[in-house]
Amino acid sequence: MRTAAAPAPIYTSRLFPAPRPRATDPTAPTWELLEHLGLVGRTDAAGVHTLLPLGLRVRDQLDRITRDAFEHHGFNSVSLPTLQSRTLWEESGRWKVYTAEGALITTRVGGTDMCLAPTSEEMAVATVRPHLRSHRDLPVRLALNTTKFRDETSPRGGLMRGREFTMADAYTFDANRAGMLESIGLLNRACTDALTGIGLHGVVQAPADGGAISAGPTTEHLVLADFGQSSILACDYCGHRGDGAILSATFPATSPPGEPVVNVIVFAVTGPDGTTRPTAVCIRSDLTISTRKLAATLGPGHHLELLDPEDLPGLLGKSAGTLTPWDCTRIDVVHDHSVSGLDRFTIADGPEDLRTGASWAGATGLPPLDLHPADVHTAADGLDCGRCPAGRYRATEAVEVAHVFELGTQYSAKMSLTFTGDDGTPRTPLMGCSGIGLTRCIQTLAGVHRDAEGLRWKHGTGPADVHLVVLRSDLTEQQERTDRTVQQLHHLGLRLIVDDRPLPAGEKFRYAQALGVPTALVLSPRHADGELEAVDRWTGRRSPITSDHLHTLRRTAS
């Protein structure tokens, strides 16, 4: 971490909100602990929070550390607008996708449809487009930290899943696939360095589903934690791991004991030519469909949505929940591997009834069916590994703190971004991008490192580097010693919290422990002039230190 000018010290006597006198509940959820200690606050809107002074200090540190990490790897820092036009998003085709999902926050400005963007691929292309002429202008690698918005359907978990959040993003543009893969490597390394720099160690990387951002390969950076709102699957034998939406399971060649139930789910699939037609998916009832795999099975350029249940009776003569594979012979059908190998299974035979003994080869009253097997299931905990014959997938709770996406020409081609190649012909650059959830990282850091006494921050990431606990701050001599010590520590570039409140020592110590700044310095009238006591929040070790040796704290904090 580079040495930088420290911000002005925070004095608890002037801090908003004032530190609460009552003790923290060590069993409280991390979000409540952050709120109790005055780092974050609630608003009247779900998924929207305030960062109070101490929380803002944390966010600013994470912002600086992540920006440094990307600049170290050759990225140029920029600031892109969050307010973006509908026209721009229609160029990429995502206006319809995101509004259909209900994820886009839209508004009108000056008679123009706009959105508060949840991501900035379109704006990155629009920013590069006027300046890209030749292959000599590539690669372009941009980094930005910005506030984003998403109309999250179920905001929860405090800062973990909100409607307004800060991201550290990066976008890359390259002349060819080899260059793009080099940039993807840089994105992953920059994310790793940034996450390590903010104090998240042991972050796991795993292949993942790119969702509405990318149809190409992606990599999640995950912190394994029991408070995570995501999960990662890993084989308990070979270690093969990833997001369930892209992993494949294997299924027995014959039906397991007890007949599985086969569900039928119908999608409206729009092809590259704009024509929409229904497609049914047959899948085991205890599994979910991976829309990423289904789209890949149908081929490039297909967009799929669940068919409106009200359209089913007119199309197939049955309502949702009563469809069987035999009702879908007039439309396209995909049979997931979870059911294509079954010799016997159960199907719906009415809203409340099930029919056993069905078979793809036919059964009483049912003709044989042609199968179109495909891998379209989402792998789940307990399923057999698709990579090795001996293991099963086990799910672990995790927090997704970063994501790297291989975009290819997904945006650049649609938005007519071109350059002149070395042979003089027009070319389309290949893109990559990444995102680190800075707001989410605040709560993740707090949750990972907290103990029974409260929060614990790694050096350089919390609201301060040093918590100066001034005992008997009402004494004139103590006030003078405080001023000298603060001046010295600030000159050393250390970020400070100064507890100068006229309170008993015990209350100040409890507050310092709960807030979790890595080093507390105790300034007591019992100490000789120039002498203090240092308390390490992580080890609890107390040791004397003189004012002549305060510079050692700078080495510790870096």
Language-model regions, residue ranges each:
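Charged, low-complexity intrinsically disordered tails and linkers
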Residues: 2-38, 122-155, 438, 448-452
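Acidic, His- and aromatic-enriched active-site or binding-groove loops in soluble protein domains
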Residues: 94-114, 222-237
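C-terminal, non-catalytic macromolecule-binding modules
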Residues: 432-462
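Generic long, charged, amphipathic alpha-helical segments
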Residues: 454-508
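Extended, low-hydrophobicity, polar/charged segments
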Residues: 42, 121-129, 154-168, 175-434, ...
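C-terminal structured "cap/appendage" subdomains that terminate the fold
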Residues: 485-552
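Short acidic loop-to-helix transition motifs that present clustered carboxylates
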Residues: 85-88, 311-314, 500-507
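TRNA-binding/sensing appendages of the translation machinery
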Residues: 2-109, 172-211, 287
